[in-house]
Amino acid sequence: MPILGHSIPLAALGTFILWLGWFGFNARSTTAANKDIAMIFVNTNLAAAAGAVLAMFTSWTKFGKPGASMTFNGALAGLVAITSPCATVSPLSAVIIGAIAGVIVVFSVIFFDRIRVDDPVGAISVHGVNGAWGTLAAGIFNMGGTSAKIIGVQILGIVSCFVWTFVTAFIMFKLIDMTIGLRVSPEEEAEGLDFSEHGGNAYPDFGVSAYAQQ
């Protein structure tokens, strides 16, 4: 049984806080105050907007309704995807990159749910899958021109990051699982960690246990 988020308005607020912060995140990477910053601002905003719109329409087509949470993930997917190429692509390319990210995130979330990966907020799809897409897009849409060598280097970077992250994360999580334990019990998960770990329930009217007792 899925455990849904308790507040769509708070999720929307969090998305817009991240969206605003991303302007500083991407523009700061130039390490200098020059005209490139304006282009980075534009590309960042366009990619996020395109990601949100395409994720909304994709989820609408797939599920019959334009899901709010998937739309938020689409905006974040666009932001993640444009991070690598933010200073080296045109505004039109930024729209294309963000739009593709919005479509990717929907199908990626569906895929990881189908193979039973516990990712309640779609972090793998937003940051992992679309991080890889953005890295590849930096080579494909480069304003200075692209080549097989450039794309090959980008793919090598993607594979290197995946191998390093997978191996180190697997070792870390395995050690945690063998010592203090990696997951809580199904009962604690259903009841809510606010209660099981802190002795209080932040949202007593929205927990599974509140309805089970009625």
Predicted segments, located by residue:
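Hydrophobic alpha-helical transmembrane bundles of multi-pass membrane proteins
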Residues: 1-214
